[in-house]
Amino acid sequence: MDYKNLVAERIKENTELEVDLIEKLIEIPPKKEMGDYAFPCFQLAKTFRKAPNLIAEELKEKINKEGFEKVVTVGPYLNFFVDKTILIKDVLEKVLSEKEKYGSSKVGEGKNVVVEYSSPNIAKPFHIGHLFTTAIGNALYKILSFEGYNCIGINHLGDWGTQFGKLISAYRRWVDEEALEKDAIGELLRIYVKFHGEAEKDPELEKEARLNFKRLEEGSEEETELWNRFKDLSLKEFNKVYDMLGIKFDSLAGESFYSDKMDAVVQEIDDKGLLVDSNGAKVVMLDEYNMPPCMIKKSDGATIYATRDLAAAIYRKKTYDFHKCIYVVGTPQALHFKQVFTTLKLMGHDWADDCKHVGFGLVKLANKKLSTRNGDVVFLEDLLNQSVEETLKIINEKNPNLKNKGDVAKKLGIGAVVFTYLKNNRERDIVFDWKEILSFDGETGPYVEYSYARGKSILRKAGELTGEADYSKLSSKEEFELAKLLGGFNDAIMNAIDKLEPAMVTRYVIEVAKAFNKFYNAHGILNAEDNDVKLARVKLVEATCQVIKNALNLLGIDVVEEM
């Protein structure tokens, strides 16, 4: 039974409000002793022409209380106490029957959502900052798909621009082929940095680089061949990380894909009378929106990121007819996306309102213990490998006889890192501290994983239990609070979708793990006082494990069955 919906239906019977609006207004009381759901009566003051606290009293008398232990007023609020036995039975039966589908819905059926995320630059390091966009984007993709949306995951690769002209010049002069095959990104970065150092002494190098890129734009065979090689070598390195994270994309259409689509966009902007000359550059003026101009073409005629993003948005709308187009890109790019979306609106594309920028913070290191390949960039692959190594050390200390230690360490280590990136509001910076990230205590990935493994251990020891569970035996505060939390899984998911914030699911699963451990510490399960209590508690454990697994899967994290 969906109690939130039941509350809404009961209120609707006595007011003119619609169920959808009532559900949005319903709150969870700040203290458990105040009830399970609260409805603020302020919204009804105009209709009833009475003070909200008087309206609450009237509704309390009229409302159908079936399914609730009691309904009380707290000032202007109407507070509902659910029937604990009915709730526990409804929630556990629903979880155990729906299993891996529990928490899902068809709310997004028939709606396409484009999610652009990860998007590293070709020939540049895939560093720890990239995991923010990669983890958030992957989680949003999974969460939206779980609720019925048809998602299109796009890795908008940074594979175009004048930097490739520079890289071609650097390659021809200084490349070490052996080093390139051994560590492609490291070698490409080395020669790119060398190019900039040499160009300060010899300005002719910059001219040569521009000429290289011009030839690439014109489709020159030699330059195109080198560009493809840089791209292939980079993707080979990137895919190592994506494989570790278990991430796949539906499209790798990067900046180069839109290179032949930009002239049409520039022409469309010009045809709408929006293109203005500014010191030789072409811009769209956005003064009335309190924004600087959106540059469309530089003074040398070259297009820039905004032009490519405009072309990409128009192409995606034509190709996918999206319900939403989500850009998971760092918060510093917020102004850029406001300019792009506003320009789209000025061009007459009202669907620009369906384009959403999902920003995120920075990653900082708590100490310098994480080694770097070139002194300043921390490669993501190295970070993940180090996390696996550190986790294996912990396993060897705590449970040296554990089977499949390597596999467990991989899942736990990588999962711990991803969990850290998704734990708090995405716009908050992350301070990376191994001691905290890999701790089995506190609000960490390993703590949640350990809670799941603890539950699975109980289920293995319990074996096959026969008979129908009598959920009225689950009468304690800890049992009710855990079951009630399990019933709120879909609410957490819908909040994550509403706010485009995976942390809503992460915070939720932390609370489930905490509630489970409170229950575990307060009550005997396998040594319960009688078989009916034992069976009911085992079912509660089984449902908890299912919800934790479903939640972690939505975050892109694998569970471990034993640790």
Swiss-Prot record:
Transmembrane segments: none annotated. It is an enzyme of class 6 (ligase). The keyword Protein biosynthesis applies. It comes from the Bacteria. Its EC number is 6.1.1.19. This is Arginine--tRNA ligase. One of its GO terms (molecular function) is ATP binding. A motif ('HIGH' region) lies at residues 120-130. Pfam families: Arg_tRNA_synt_N (PF03485), DALR_1 (PF05746), tRNA-synt_1d (PF00750). It catalyses: tRNA(Arg) + L-arginine + ATP = L-arginyl-tRNA(Arg) + AMP + diphosphate. Keywords: Aminoacyl-tRNA synthetase, ATP-binding, Cytoplasm, Ligase, Nucleotide-binding, Protein biosynthesis. Belongs to the class-I aminoacyl-tRNA synthetase family. It is found in: Cytoplasm. HAMAP family: Arg_tRNA_synth. Monomer. It comes from Clostridium botulinum (strain Hall / ATCC 3502 / NCTC 13319 / Type A). GO terms for biological process: arginyl-tRNA aminoacylation. The keyword Phosphoprotein does not apply. One of its GO terms (cellular component) is cytoplasm. Its main location: cytoplasm.
